[in-house]
Amino acid sequence: MKTNDYVKYMTQQFVKYIDTPRDERKERKEVRKETKTPVSQQWFGILPYGFRLWLKRKK
C-alpha cells in the first residue's frame, strides 16, 4: 500500500466519523462497551473463567 493510498483511506475514515451525528457515535460507543469481553478472558481464553467457577464451587 502506497503512502498516498493510506492517507486517502485515513481521510475517508475521518470524514465518515465526523459526518456521523454525535448522539449516534455515543450510542455506538456504549454498545461496544456493553458487548466487550472481560480482559482476563480476552487475554487468556476460558481458563480464568473456569478457574473462577472452580473456586466458587469450592467455597
Curated annotation (Swiss-Prot):
InterPro entries: YqzE. Pfam families: YqzE. This is Uncharacterized protein YqzE. It comes from Bacillus subtilis (strain 168). The gene is yqzE.
